């Protein structure tokens, strides 16, 4: 019975509403924590997952063996792979496309790759001006990988204990 009476008085005095208004008033006059984005940037996590890249072996041969595990594991169905057999009997990709509008940057493709071919880089800033530019093809992915290979290798070596 006493519990109902206290609940009645709390509701009558609108204590929950006043508590919420006090919290709003308290944060209204505190300094805001903002970043002026293009000029200032937040520090990135060492495990940040950004734009994709395809890697090569040190001899220049691409690493991808067209096992299609990344295509199978992708929850957003953003990866499309076509493959063909070469003269020596190995499989290689003829087409490797990633639709960045579909991709959710979960990192499953990177985790499932048995030869560390597909990796996600630290690149956060990219834009598209025309229709169809959101689909990154194999030559573009290889170019990104070639340009950032030393940084990718350093990041993977630093993160090796957690893989």
From Swiss-Prot:
What is its cofactor? [4Fe-4S] cluster
Q: Where does [4Fe-4S] cluster 2 bind?
A: 74, 103, 106, 109
Catalysed reaction equations from the record: a quinone + NADH + 5 H(+)(in) = a quinol + NAD(+) + 4 H(+)(out)
Per the UniProt record, which EC number(s) apply here? 7.1.1.-
User: What remark does the entry make about the cofactor?
Assistant: Binds 2 [4Fe-4S] clusters per subunit.
**Mind listing the GO biological process terms from this record?**
aerobic respiration
Residues in 4Fe-4S ferredoxin-type domain copies: 54-84, 94-123
Q: Member of which family?
A: Belongs to the complex I 23 kDa subunit family.
Recorded hits in PROSITE patterns, A to Z, give: 4FE4S_FER_1, 4FE4S_FER_2
Q: What does this protein do?
A: NDH-1 shuttles electrons from NADH, via FMN and iron-sulfur (Fe-S) centers, to quinones in the respiratory chain. The immediate electron acceptor for the enzyme in this species is believed to be ubiquinone. Couples the redox reaction to proton translocation (for every two electrons transferred, four hydrogen ions are translocated across the cytoplasmic membrane), and thus conserves the redox energy in a proton gradient.
Q: Where is [4Fe-4S] cluster 1 annotated to bind? A: 64, 67, 70, 113
Alphabetic keyword roster: 4Fe-4S, Cell inner membrane, Cell membrane, Iron, Iron-sulfur, Membrane, Metal-binding, NAD, Quinone, Repeat, Translocase, Ubiquinone
**Quick one: where is this thing mainly located?**
membrane
What InterPro entries does the record point to? Answer: 4Fe4S_Fe-S-bd, 4Fe4S_Fe_S_CS, NADH_quinone_OxRdtase_chainI
Q: What GO molecular function terms would the record report?
A: 4 iron, 4 sulfur cluster binding; iron ion binding; NADH:ubiquinone reductase (non-electrogenic) activity; quinone binding
Location of this chain's protein in the cell? Cell inner membrane
Q: Which Pfam families match?
A: Fer4_7
- This protein is called NADH-quinone oxidoreductase subunit I
Protein source organism: Xanthomonas oryzae pv. oryzae (strain KACC10331 / KXO85)
**Subunit composition and interactions:** NDH-1 is composed of 14 different subunits. Subunits NuoA, H, J, K, L, M, N constitute the membrane sector of the complex.
Q: Which cysteines are joined by disulfide bonds?
A: none
């Amino acid at each position: 019975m006493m519990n109902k009476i206290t609940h009645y008085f709390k509701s009558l005095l609108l204590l929950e509403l006043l508590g919420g208004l006090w919290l709003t008033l308290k944060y209204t006059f505190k300094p805001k924590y903002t970043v002026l984005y293009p000029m200032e940037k937040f520090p990135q996590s060492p495990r940040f997952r950004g734009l994709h890249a395809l890697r090569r072996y040190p001899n220049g041969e691409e690493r991808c063996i067209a096992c299609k595990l990344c295509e199978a594991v992708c929850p957003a169905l953003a990866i499309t792979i076509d493959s063909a057999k070469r003269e020596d009997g190995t499989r290689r990709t003829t087409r490797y496309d990633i639709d960045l509008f579909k991709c959710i940057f979960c990192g499953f493709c990177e985790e499932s790759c048995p030869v560390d071919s597909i990796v996600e880089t630290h690149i956060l800033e990219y834009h598209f001006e025309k229709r169809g530019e959101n689909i990154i093809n194999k030559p573009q992915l290889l170019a990104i990988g070639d340009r950032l290979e030393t940084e990718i290798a350093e990041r993977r070596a630093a993160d090796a204990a957690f893989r």
